[in-house]
Regions:
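Membrane-interfacial helical/loop segments at transmembrane boundaries in membrane proteins
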Residues: 1-4, 103-121, 182-218
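Ferredoxin-type iron-sulfur electron-transfer modules and their immediate structural context
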Residues: 191-193, 220, 234-357, 405
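Alpha-helical membrane-embedded segments
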Residues: 18-27, 133-137, 169-171, 216-253
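Iron-sulfur-cluster electron-transfer modules
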Residues: 2-139, 146, 281-290, 312-316, ...
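Juxtamembrane inter-helical linkers in multi-pass membrane proteins
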Residues: 38-63, 149-163, 191-204, 246-274, ...
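Juxtamembrane/interface segments at transmembrane-helix termini
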Residues: 27-46, 101-106, 139-157, 178-193, ...
Length: 676
């Protein structure tokens, strides 16, 4: 845009840079006091390792809009609009440096930045882009405030901030076009006078009788209007959710690079406070999450707890924590030992919502700005259990059983080896040199329905002539339920006991049928020094099938809808192997659970310790998932997890369809297809 003339005797560039300096001063003051100072109250955290990997991810997430666009393949095209606005905004930011600030200092375009041809091309691009963005902004307004999809229907997502920003950006686009138009109308020449839309409008204004003097005045008005909007935007950002434009790239850089399924390790010996009960107990990355949050509602819209009528809203957890931090910000210092504790679980975040979380990771998967909700929620759950001894009664019963019996199945009548009766399965005590440890797990060993899964696995291993053994009575719970229910202390006791036992037998390779055991041993035992090669059965059996070690031959005539376990799929990226096993079964027709499959799979309701925590609000999560299964019209829902088998079977039974539909582990169907 061609700048107007000087302001009387005052050179234009002086006015521009004085106003810019003032706006930047206000921005930096607010940014420090409303963001930096508050975030630095948090505890130190990792995030400075593997810089190239971090930078690559941050660029893809922020500049590339990777997570925003990932939903397009599922038919959600809102991300295209957001990415267009974002990339357009970046383009205009570049143009401000060239056309507004640098040009105002020279009274014309600084030729050393671009050649005349470059200016012409770039001006045409900005002219067309301004029109495109104006259309996209109208669509964004209609979508958010008229059509209003479910994820944008919250008071938080309909806040006036978003409307103000849309109006400001629209003002930038219109003022760009009109500045060009009135430059043409006053007889201006050069590359900026040749832009398509601006030239057409300028000629139209001339035809309407707008004179050179009026056009000159209006060109100055819209040029200054454009600059004013830029300055207002600069000052306004630190006070709104649009701080995420600056916080999101930083947040993405410092995202966790640890396995998705691993909760952060707690050093019990050197930790004064267990979990997080006030702002200062969180890490600075967890506090930064609140500023990175775009309040888009994607996390809450994906949350199975929220979708079934529970209190939990991941978006509100993050935003309420940030708002609480800002509200008490006048007390905050980097080392605030003197600050009176202000509990976040008293009126800020409800305890019920903390216990609603299933640890399924759907919120993290959907978040476009690398907010990590689950560790934050789990730190509050740890605080409730370890600092305040608070938990639902059903959770307390399971934790007590874990502590007393080494498993959560209170009241079971089975021993660790009853499931193997008649199968002649050796223990490591009997066969210490076995190549593979088959980790049975509490549920397949001690819960009647799930014992069929363990038996199927043993039959398949024998058919493939795998050199394996089990721990038998030496096996105890991996500790996953304890950790997911907030008792980190009990988790570490159980985990260390298992690590010591396996190291005593020099175990190298572990195969398990339970994704929760798999995730814990693979991703969390290394935190305690337990380093083993851990495979889920689907990975191991898929290899056996490909090598020809087992050959399914019996026709099964089953139409199976496959349900992805959260701890196998989202947390560990194991999607293809279970499907590979299913496809190898003769006569099995595999179908997907609509759009709720793979990384967008819907939790069965058992994660986060909820296998043993009773649901008291809304629809049961497993019933909602059962409804999704029934929509496929398959006769069987296939899973790769003993928890999922139980939850889906109960859902089918609750709907009175257990004579028509069934829930089975893929492993069971595979075993039935073998000639044993």
């Amino acid at each position: 845009m061609v700048p107007p003339g000087d302001i009387g005797a005052l050179p234009l560039w002086v006015g521009v840079f004085v106003l810019l300096g003032l706006a930047l001063a206000i921005f930096h003051y607010a940014f420090y006091h409303r963001v930096v100072r508050l975030v630095l109250q948090g505890k130190k955290t990792a995030g400075f390792d593997r810089p190239l990997e971090r930078l690559k991810g941050a660029l893809l997430i922020s500049l590339g809009q990777q997570k925003v666009l990932q939903r397009v393949k599922y038919g959600d095209y809102a991300g295209i609009g957001h990415a267009t606005i974002f990339w357009g905004f970046l383009t205009f930011m570049l143009s401000y440096g060239i056309f507004v600030f640098a040009a105002s200092a020279k009274g014309g375009f600084p030729e050393w930045l671009l050649t005349e041809t470059g200016v012409r091309v770039y001006s045409q691009y900005l002219d067309i882009l301004a029109a495109v963005l104006a259309v996209v902004l109208v669509w964004a307004f209609v979508r958010r405030w008229v059509l209003t999809p479910s994820r944008l229907a919250f008071d938080l997502t309909r806040h006036s901030d978003a409307l103000i920003i849309v109006v400001l950006i629209m003002g930038l686009m219109l003022s760009t076009i009109l500045t060009h138009a009135f430059w043409v109308a006053q007889g201006g020449t050069g590359p900026e006078a040749d832009v398509f839309i601006g030239k057409a409008l300028g000629e139209l204004f001339t035809d309407w009788g707008i004179g050179v003097s009026a056009a000159n005045t209006l060109q100055g008005v819209f040029w200054w209007s454009h600059l004013s909007i830029i300055l207002i935007f600069t000052v306004y950002i630190p006070f709104t959710k649009h701080m995420h434009m600056f916080a999101a790239p930083v947040n993405a850089y410092f995202r966790s690079l640890e396995p998705k399924g691993a909760l952060p390790f707690m050093d019990l010996e050197n930790t004064e406070k267990f979990g997080a009960g006030r702002v200062q107990d969180f890490t600075w990355k967890q506090l930064l999450d609140g500023y990175a949050c775009a309040v888009c509602g994607r996390c809450t819209d994906a949350c199975p707890a929220n979708l079934t009528g529970k209190q939990l809203s991941p978006m509100h957890i993050v935003e309420n924590l940030k708002d609480h931090m800002v509200a008490i910000g006048h007390q905050g210092e980097r080392n605030p030992e003197h600050v009176e504790p202000l509990p976040i679980l008293e009126g800020v975040i409800s305890e019920t919502s903390i216990w609603d979380c299933l640890n399924c990771g759907a919120c993290i998967e959907e978040c476009p700005v690398a907010v990590e909700h689950v560790p934050t929620i789990m730190d509050m759950r740890r605080h409730l259990v370890l600092e305040e001894s608070k938990a639902p009664e059903s959770a307390m019963n399971a934790l007590l059983s874990l502590e007393q019996r080494g498993h959560p199945w209170r009241g079971t009548q089975y021993s660790r080896t009853d499931w193997a009766e008649g199968l002649e399965v050796p223990t490591l005590a009997e066969k210490p040199d076995a190549e593979v440890l088959f980790w049975v797990g509490c549920t397949p060993a001690l819960e009647q329905r799930s014992q069929a899964i363990a038996r199927s696995m043993a039959k398949i291993l024998k058919a493939a002539k795998v050199d394996f053994a089990i721990l038998g009575d030496e096996e105890t719970c991996t500790g996953d339920p304890a950790r997911r229910m907030g008792n980190e202390y009990l988790f570490q006791i159980l985990a260390q006991q298992n690590i010591d036992t396996m190291n005593g037998y020099n175990v190298k390779k572990v195969v398990t049928t339970c994704p929760h055991c798999f995730n814990t041993m693979k991703n969390e035992y290394p935190q305690l020094g337990g380093k083993f090669e851990v495979l889920h059965y689907s990975q191991f059996v898929d290899q056996l099938i490909k090598k020809g070690s087992i050959k399914p031959v019996k026709m099964m005539n089953v139409t199976m809808a496959y349900h992805d376990s959260c701890f196998l799929g989202r947390h560990n990226g194991v999607y293809d192997e279970p499907r590979g096993v299913a496809k190898a079964i003769p006569g099995l027709k595999l179908v997907e659970m609509g759009s709720r499959c793979r990384e967008r799979g819907f939790c069965c309701g058992a994660g986060g310790g909820h296998m043993w925590i009773e649901e008291s609000q809304g629809t049961r999560v497993n019933h909602a998932r059962t409804d999704q299964f029934l929509e496929t019209e398959a006769d069987t829902v296939g899973v790769s997890c003993p928890f999922c088998v139980q939850m889906m079977a109960e859902g089918i039974q609750a709907k009175g369809l257990d004579s028509e539909k069934e829930a089975k582990d893929v492993l069971e169907i595979l075993a039935d297809s073998l000639e044993l």
